Amino acid sequence: MLRGNNIKKVNSLLVRSFHSTVGNRSGGPSTPINYPSLEIENAGEKQKMNLFQAINNGMDIAMQKDSKAVVFGEDVGFGGVFRCTVGLRDKYGASRVFNTPLCEQGIAGFAIGLAAQGATPIAEIQFADYIFPAFDQIVNEAAKYRYRSGGQFDCGSLTIRSPYGAVGHGGHYHSQSPESYFGHTPGLKVVIPSTPIEAKGLLLASIREKDPVIFFEPKLMYRSAVEEVPIGDYEIPLGKARIVKEGKDITIIGWGAQMRVLLQAVNMAEEKLGISCELIDLRTIQPWDVETVVESVKKTGRVVISHEAPKTGGWAAEISATIQERCFLHLEAPIQRVCGYDTPFPLIFEKFYVPDHLKNFESIKKTMVY
Amino acid sequence: MLSNFLKVNSKALGHIRTFASKSGEIKHNFKKADTYLCDGPSDSTVTNKDELISFFTEMSRFRRLETVCDGLYKKKLIRGFCHLYTGQEAVCAGLESAITKDDHIITAYRDHTYMLSRGATPEEIFAELLMKETGCSKGKGGSMHMFTKNFYGGNGIVGAQCPLGAGIAFAQKYNKTGNVCLAMYGDGAANQGQLFEAFNMASLWKLPVIFICENNKYGMGTSQKRSTAGHDFYTRGHYVAGLKVDGMDVFAVKEAGKYAAEWCRAGNGPIILEMDTYRYVGHSMSDPGITYRTREEVNHVRQTRDPIENIRQIILDNKIATEDQLAAIEETVRDEMEKASEKAIAAPLPQARELFTNVYLQEVPVRGVEFVNSFKP
């Protein structure tokens, strides 16, 4: 169910040289990790872009095609701290691309009001860790506007973008993964892309989505993830997972920056143990693609789910619960969750904390011999 | 030499007027504070040799601390987020001299110098930045998570510390300690809603809290002019009295601090001090600091308003010490910071189990990937 008429095929796979130069942040090799990106056909010519450039390109297209689209947030006027909005003010003017004061609650509330008037606000919260002052506006106002007015009002055109996740040395307030807080809130959609191509297509779909979307961007990959991104307009539908790699023995589920770590673990498991892994990129956290996951688990009978956020109450818990409801008699082993520890995100201990490829490899191994 | 490096033009510091008397007392005039709902302190003070040398030494220590941090960051020994105080030293030094060590301070993330002024050692500050076991927070927090006696951090979320300051002040009132709390924030944080919630509570309950807006003109990369309606932060409390102070003159800061502390101790409730100051460096280490302002602007402030050069000039004009003697002080400071950073670099990393400690009061099991691999206290 594709809304972008430029896409013929989304699920076809093509291995591209999408790689990271900081691959050893979790103890792995520093050599580039090839990550299979998807192929977008008929979206025009391609250009080498990293993740922030792909997001910039996506916003550029959104603003060009939708004269009501506006971009705002802290320091976005001169390009934003991660350069995602660079050049947009020059192109679309200071009345459509502007800096806000440092007031996250105000930014979110302002964006909701603007959306209720039919504009297309694309608000930036500078770090996902700073989204909590805006939590009330997002959870109580944005998520419930349509419901509590019986459909008279909504802020469906709202998109809030925010960089999330480990970055190497971010410490307590620049590293968190808050997707579960928002996934727990009916009325919101939560999206996390894993590659530049994905980021552009998912962002365009999120901006045009008629329900409020929280779009978390893996900041570790802003510069390190580079691939040939189509420069045309295309969308990747929300709520659809991507099977990155087909396999028969075990299902591995992740999203965002974790996909690269999981691919590394999967490659290790295949090379060292001959295990055939099916790797799924969830893409949308809420509503998540239950059917794709269930279908895969029914085939493999074994599951590992991995995210950076703490284990308890993380989104892997929701996925696990659903899998046991839907696939109980198909399961050959307990579902494994490879996640962050139940501690604040640490500074010095980041390497211990993150669910790296070795922890995932161990988990795959254990699950296979259960 | 720092003075050569800065190319300080003594004529540019012409607004400082001092008069030495035979008793060794030196009268110093400064720009009178703008006032709101209060009379404010006078525009002059009397100082002496000891105080001048002490301010010179303290502020040189503050600046040197940050210079060493900058160097360690560039060597990639300090990682992550790091915000330097360079240029704003007079605010910290002046306020600390206006209160006692029993009073309380809470600030935002530009906190290294407050640690030093509160009495922490340079070594524990560097060690925290270097994520070492001997750091003030056991190396667990880093730059923006520093704490010591009567200093409540070191807070990374913009504006979040201000309501905490009101709570700390309430405890002083309730327990009749006679102490005050300084709640510091920047011009960027001045637009956070929770600051106004704190103003209201503090005023309603007449809490002994001094809200201090360190207005360094830029909230990250956004000029105050582009982020803030009305440019007077000291009047923004509406029903809260305020002063706008020359935050580059340590004596102006000290007198305003004393006035505010007396105001609070007399039971008048909160007061706001807006410190007209400036940071020479970028917002954080990744900000070169010249994309949203000109190099000329930064240099102009350095040459005309530098708080340390300001004091140096008073000392030299009044023949309290020679240039060589001041250079010797700077050398001692340099040596102190150098030794402290070397010790911090040599200190061990925290034990791995520290990942799991201090999550709750009691150490609790922390789930790992598999139950058997979980942490058990």
Curated annotation (Swiss-Prot), chain A:
Q: Name one GO cellular component term.
A: mitochondrial matrix
Q: Which domain of life is it from?
A: Eukaryota
> Known catalysed reaction(s)?
N(6)-[(R)-lipoyl]-L-lysyl-[protein] + 3-methyl-2-oxobutanoate + H(+) = N(6)-[(R)-S(8)-2-methylpropanoyldihydrolipoyl]-L-lysyl-[protein] + CO2
Molecular function (GO) terms listed? 3-methyl-2-oxobutanoate dehydrogenase (2-methylpropanoyl-transferring) activity; metal ion binding
Can you say where in the cell this protein is located?
Mitochondrion matrix
EC no.?
1.2.4.4
**Mitochondrion listed as a keyword:** yes
List each coiled-coil range: none
Please give a single GO biological process term from the UniProt record: branched-chain amino acid catabolic process
Q: Where does K(+) bind?
A: 156, 158-159, 209
Enumerate the UniProt keywords alphabetically: Metal-binding, Mitochondrion, Oxidoreductase, Potassium, Transit peptide
Cofactor(s) this protein requires? thiamine diphosphate
Where is thiamine diphosphate bound in this sequence? 130
Q: Where is the transit peptide?
A: 1-25
Query: Which proteins does it associate with, and in what oligomeric form?
Result: Heterotetramer of 2 alpha and 2 beta chains.
Role this protein plays? The branched-chain alpha-keto dehydrogenase complex catalyzes the overall conversion of alpha-keto acids to acyl-CoA and CO(2). It contains multiple copies of three enzymatic components: branched-chain alpha-keto acid decarboxylase (E1), lipoamide acyltransferase (E2) and lipoamide dehydrogenase (E3).
Write down what this protein is called: 2-oxoisovalerate dehydrogenase subunit beta, mitochondrial
Query: Which organism was this protein described from?
Result: Dictyostelium discoideum (Social amoeba)
Recorded name of the encoding gene: bkdB
Swiss-Prot record, chain B:
The UniProt record lists the EC number as 1.2.4.1
Give the record's GO CC terms: mitochondrial matrix; phagocytic vesicle; pyruvate dehydrogenase complex
Q: Which residues bind Mg(2+)?
A: 187, 216, 218
**Catalyzed reaction equations:** N(6)-[(R)-lipoyl]-L-lysyl-[protein] + pyruvate + H(+) = N(6)-[(R)-S(8)-acetyldihydrolipoyl]-L-lysyl-[protein] + CO2
Q: Does the keyword Nucleus apply?
A: no
Q: Which domain of life is it from?
A: Eukaryota
Q: Which UniProt keywords are present, listed alphabetically?
A: Magnesium, Metal-binding, Mitochondrion, Oxidoreductase, Pyruvate, Thiamine pyrophosphate, Transit peptide
Which residues are noted in the entry as thiamine diphosphate-binding?
A: 109-110, 156, 158, 187-189, 216, 283
Q: What is its main location?
A: mitochondrion
A GO molecular-function descriptor: metal ion binding
Name the cofactor(s): thiamine diphosphate; Mg(2+)
* GO annotation, biological process: pyruvate decarboxylation to acetyl-CoA
What is its EC class? oxidoreductase
Q: State its role.
A: The pyruvate dehydrogenase complex catalyzes the overall conversion of pyruvate to acetyl-CoA and CO(2). It contains multiple copies of three enzymatic components: pyruvate dehydrogenase (E1), dihydrolipoamide acetyltransferase (E2) and lipoamide dehydrogenase (E3).
Q: Tell me, how does this one assemble?
A: Tetramer of 2 alpha and 2 beta subunits.
| Protein name listed in UniProt | Pyruvate dehydrogenase E1 component subunit alpha, mitochondrial
Lineage here is:
Eukaryota, Amoebozoa, Evosea, Eumycetozoa, Dictyostelia
